Amino acid sequence: SSAASDVYKRQGYGRTAITDGDKSITEITCHARGAHFLNPEVRTVIDIGGQDSKVIRLDENGAVANFVMNDKCAAGTGRFLEMMARTMEMDLDQMSEAGLTYKEDITISSMCTVFAESEVVSLIAQNKETDDIVHGLNKAVASKTAALAKRVGGEERYMMTGGVSKNKGLVKTLEEKLGTTLVISDKAQLCGALGAALFAMDMVQK
C-alpha cells in the first residue's frame, strides 16, 4: 500500500475474523512493541484484559524474550472482577476505589469464578466491610498475576496495560506483591493497537 491509512493489521482474538487485513500479528508481539514505544526502559509487561491475563518479558530492543498467558478461564481477568462487582452490586469505578482503605486482611481462597462468588456472598452475609472484601479480591488477582510474572522471569521495569490497569486498588496490591512501582500509561488500553499500528507503519516505509 502507498499510504499508512491503507494498511490494515489484525491482532488479538478477532484477528482471524477479518479476511482483508494485510498481515496478522499476535497480540503478544503487538503489546511488546507498543510497550517499548511508550517506555523503552520497560522489561516486563503485565496485561490484564477482559478475556485473559498475560505477562511478557522484553529484551532491550523491545522484542519478546518470553511470555506466559492465563486464557483457560476467567480467573485473574477483568471478567472475573466484573462478575465480582456485579455480585457486590457495584460498578467498576466504585470497585477501583474500594479496597484502598481496608481494615481486615481477608483472603479469597478460590480463583474459580463460581466458588469465589460463593465466598463473596458468604462474606456479605457475615456483614464484612465492602472495602475488606474488595481487597481480598484484589489480593487474589494480584497473587495470581505475580505468580505469572515469576514464571516468566519478570524484571524491572514493569508496565501494566489493559483495562484493569485503571483499577487503583488492584494496581496498589499488585505493586506490593511485586515490590516495585508499575508504569501505567494513559494509553494503557491501546497498547496492543499501538503496537499493531507501528508494525503497519513499518510496512508502509519499506
What are these regions (language model features)?
Residues 78-82, 185-206:
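Glycine-rich phosphate-binding/hydrolytic loop that grips phosphoryl groups
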Residues 1-7:
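Short, small-residue-biased leader/transition segments that mark boundaries at the very start
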Residues 26-87, 184:
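Glycine-rich phosphate-binding loop of actin/hexokinase-like ATP-binding domains
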Residues 75, 82, 86-124:
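Conserved ATP-utilizing enzyme core subdomain
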Residues 27, 175-194:
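Conserved phosphate-binding/catalytic loops in two-lobed NTP-binding clefts
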Residues 13-14, 153-177, 188-189:
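Glycine-rich phosphate-binding loops at beta-strand->alpha-helix junctions
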Residues 116-149, 189:
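Adenine-nucleotide phosphate-binding core of ATP-dependent small-molecule kinases
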